[in-house]
Amino acid sequence: DKGSYKVSGGLHGVGVSCVNALSTLMHVEVSREGKLYMQEYSCGTPLAPVAEVGTSTNNGTLVTFMPDSSIFIESVYKWDILANRLRELSFLNAGITLTLTDKRSVNEDGTFKSEVFHSEEGLKEFVEYIDESREPLIDNIIHITTEKNGIPVEIAMTYNTSYNENIHSYVNNINTIEGGTHLSGFRRGLTRTLKKYAEDSKMLEKLKIEISGDDFREGLTAV
C-alpha cells in the first residue's frame, strides 16, 4: 500500500494500547463537541463503558496512567529524557506548543518545575540547535519541502567545519535510528547532485581524484 507511510512509521512503537496493558490504572478523558467523556481501564481491560460525564469548552484528550509495579522494577520518570523528546517533537511539528511540568519538583516560589517547547521554523531551527556549538561553512540553512505520491517530505541541512556526518531521519515523528530507504535515498540523491555539479563545473578535473559519497557528507548536518 503506497499510502501506508502517510500515517505509519513502519516500526513497532509503544502506543496507547501497550501503555494501557502495562498500567494498573489508565484514566482517559475526551473533550469533544462540547461534551466530556471518560473511561477507565486496568491492565488493558475497561472497568466500565465510555460515559458522558459533563460538558467542556475544550477539544482534546487527557490520559493519566499508573505503571504496573509487578512488571516494572523501577518507574521513575527522567526529566532529561522527556524534555529531549518534547523538544524534538516541537522541532518536527513547527508551530505547536508542548509543555512539560514536573510536580515532583517545586521551585522556591511554590510553582512546579516546567519548560515550554515551541518552534516556528521547525527543522531549520532543529539543525541550528544541533549545530549550535559548531562552526558553520555556509551562512543559511538549506530547507526543502516537497511531496511525492501524496506523502510530504521535508529536509533541512547545512555544513560545518567538522569531518563528521550528522544525519537524523524521522518518519511521522518516529526517529528511524536504523535508517531506511528514505535515508539511503537522500544520501544517493545528495551524492548524485553534488557530483554532477562538480563535474559540470570541471572541479574534479583539477583534483584528479575520485570523489565518493563520504566526501560529500563530511561536515553535513541534516534532518
Where are the regions a protein language model picked out?
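GHKL/Histidine-kinase-like ATPase module
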Residues: D80, E88-L89, G95, T99-V223
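GHKL-type ATPase core
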Residues: D1-E120
